[in-house]
Amino acid sequence: MYSRCIALVFVGLLASSLAANCYGPAGKLAVAEFDAFPSPVAVGGTVYIRTNIQPTYDMGSATVQLSVYYSDNFDVTGLKPVVDIPGLQLCNLSTSITCPITAGTHILAWEYRVPDVLPGTYQVKYTILEDNPPDGNPYSCIQFSITVEGQKTNEFTSWYQATLLGTALFTQPDYKLRQIGEALQVGPSGPLNGSISPVPYNGSIKYLSGSGDLVPNAFYDTSNFVWGLSGTMVKQTIGALGQISHIYQGECYLGYINNINTSIAGNFYDYMTPLIDGTFTLNWTYTDSSTAEINGVAQFQPAATIPYGWGFPLLYGRLGEHQVVTSDVGFLMIKGNMPFCTSGVCAAPPAQGGSKHHGLSSQKLGLAIGLPIAGVFLIILIAAAIIYYRKRRESEKEDGVFAVSRKPEYGSALVVDGIIEETMGSKTMQAMLDMRDDDESEHDSDDGYGRSGQSGRSGRSRSRSRSRSVSRSRSGSRDARSESDPGESASRDSDSD
């Protein structure tokens, strides 16, 4: 007799641990509310499970299949396909699951298939028993319903996680799955059209674009999204907290891959978005292989640290009729905040954790705020400089002081009240020397010699007039200088007399 093993050896019975997919352009999913009751369990113990499939709508001749397609150290027996008899409202499946004999985190995924069912709503109940008698008292009952629209294959898959710490199961506070039946947000009608080019992961977020925004727990038909992958894959399984990847018999969860064949094109369709908000990265890592086996790795990385029981299945999709290959990464952004969880306790994201959960990082947000502010300060600085320069020019003009720019041979001069205070240039200097000669000759002459004195004053007056008219041409300056020569000659004649 195996030791007792609790029914919820699978602690991860949360909204993120349960997913369903109904095919069709407007597929819907409804999940009932239930509680999870973690409790200690012995390593190597056995749990007996009886699954009641009880449809609320006649399933007709549909075949119900229950299978485990991934078991991490779990010994699962008794899972066999069951044929539903038309009109029968109850189907029972009994099985036993033996817990791993080693401590650690272990994953068990099992799947129900109800192909080709008629439109309607179906209920599925998981009745988990603690001990061997199939009719023993149930420890927990988990139920959810599926709404099928159209003649499409209906599949839904549950993932369970058991973390064995020594001889006891990892325990955490009770969690209640949020009811998402009536509050289900369905994606836009019709398919999302677009193209995604896989790019190497560089830490950035790539939005899955199309007609309408993606919302949590919504169904999207992305059959027109082409990934354009090629080659073959190598089978590999990786399991870690917050990072789950697996491909088994052509099927993979967290990036669900099914019906893979030897085609070298890839269409990713029937996308089931995560049940919780946040930023999620779907990594596809493939290497070449010469074998005919279906191989590959699909890796899913949530944006936040998550405790046991969270994180899968957060992303549900299907890759049909194609073989996916290459080494690339796809990105999916769900608007909103993903709960930030540590030690099994979930709370709102920390204030500084926004960059992990949103498209804008803190660095980009700082630039988005800082650059406009810097631009405003720059504009104010330029305007102040212009105003200061204009006021200075006006003040200088009022004082009669302004700068004059001339040709190189005339240099530049500073004119104060029409009088040249400082000059540069050979020709301008020569003009200044000529004016100095005029002044000296005028002082040497006597008032009795009116001709020479008048000529000297006339020359000085013309020189001052020439100084005030700074824009006069060079030829005009030479003419003015030549006009003063008779006065100078007369002054010299007077001196000789």
UniProtKB/Swiss-Prot annotation:
GO CC aspect terms: membrane
SUPFAM superfamilies: E set domains
Mutagenesis or variant effect for residue 464 to K: Reduced phosphorylation by PSRPK
Composition bias type Basic residues, residue spans: 459-471
All ranges on the Cytoplasmic side of the membrane: 388-497
Stretches with biased composition (Basic and acidic residues): 476-497
PTM field: Phosphorylated on serine residues in the RS domain by PSRPK.
Outcome reported for the amino acid change (mutating residue 465 to T): Reduced phosphorylation by PSRPK
InterPro entries on file: Ig_E-set, ML_dom
Entry membrane topology: Single-pass type I membrane protein
Keyword entries, A-Z: Glycoprotein, Membrane, Phosphoprotein, Signal, Transmembrane, Transmembrane helix
Ranges per topology, Extracellular: 20-366
Pfam families referenced in this protein's UniProt entry, alphabetically: E1_DerP2_DerF2 (PF02221)
Glycosites: 92, 193, 202, 261, 283
Record Gene3D superfamilies: 2.60.40.770
Protein name (record): Serine/arginine-rich protein PSR
